[in-house]
Amino acid sequence: MSTYLVGDVHGCLVELKALLAQVSFNPEQDTLWLTGDLVARGPDSLQVLRFVRSLGSSVRMVLGNHDLHLLAVYAGISRNKPKDRLNDLLTAPDADELINWLRRQPILQVDEDLKLVMAHAGITPQWDLPTALVCAREVESILSSDSYPLFLDAMYGDMPNHWSPELSGLARLRFSTNVFTRMRYCFSGGQLDMLCKEQPGQAPSLLKPWFDLPSQVAGEYAIAFGHWASLEGKGTPENIYALDTGCCWGGELTMLRWDDKRYFTQPSLSSNTELSGDITL
């Protein structure tokens, strides 16, 4: 029985299956953790959702910003952009079933036995783990409810960018969503900067990658995240693992076997080279 962590799939089904074949993944014995952004930009978003769903309880995934964007597009709240390559999914006969399954997936995973935490973008240094869990469950609760279109309509935006326990309502949900699915840089006080997408070292000096600020979580737990492909899996402190290595942009799909911390990679087999930045979400 092994635990495998895989970075952002982004519709790259062939690469995902090839990576699983490298380790002879057995869904009856092994567990697959996915950092989110299953869909968009790559060629096979529909088949990725079908495949991941078919793996049942052997999968522990989190939602990413592109997954949330898909939910908003399907709900008629956001526009379907050709570069996201979602048409097959949106018009599939089982689209309703897949969308309803997707919106009931977690936004944060915590395993107390493994001392492992996973979120698509990371955990703000302003939170301890109990706070992160509360905020995650609030987002998950509304996403799985009949009120989810109201949340999807309100989630777009960069403010508020600073945590306060007094935050409430849609503003609180938006902040939490930005932390879990969009965050890269913070100011020294922990406030989110949602604009900078430069690589570390090229960002303004006032900004720090979230993982370079003192963490209230990473001392006791490992943190795995995706989202930030330009990191190429490098430059994070000990006990923090960046797993998005840009497969859909011609990079590779990365897997970490948690048991022995061994990495496996699968080079991209797709031809999508239209790297044009993340959607604003």
From Swiss-Prot:
Stated name of the protein: Bis(5'-nucleosyl)-tetraphosphatase, symmetrical
SUPFAM superfamilies listed in its UniProt record: Metallo-dependent phosphatases
Function, as annotated: Hydrolyzes diadenosine 5',5'''-P1,P4-tetraphosphate to yield ADP.
Single GO MF annotation: bis(5'-nucleosyl)-tetraphosphatase (symmetrical) activity
Keywords: Hydrolase
EC number in record: 3.6.1.41
Family: Belongs to the Ap4A hydrolase family.
InterPro entries named among the record's database cross-references: ApaH (IPR004617), Calcineurin-like_PHP_ApaH (IPR004843), Metallo-depent_PP-like (IPR029052)
Catalytic activity: P(1),P(4)-bis(5'-adenosyl) tetraphosphate + H2O = 2 ADP + 2 H(+)
A Pfam family matched in the record: Metallophos
Lineage, opening ranks: Bacteria, Pseudomonadati, Pseudomonadota, Gammaproteobacteria, Enterobacterales
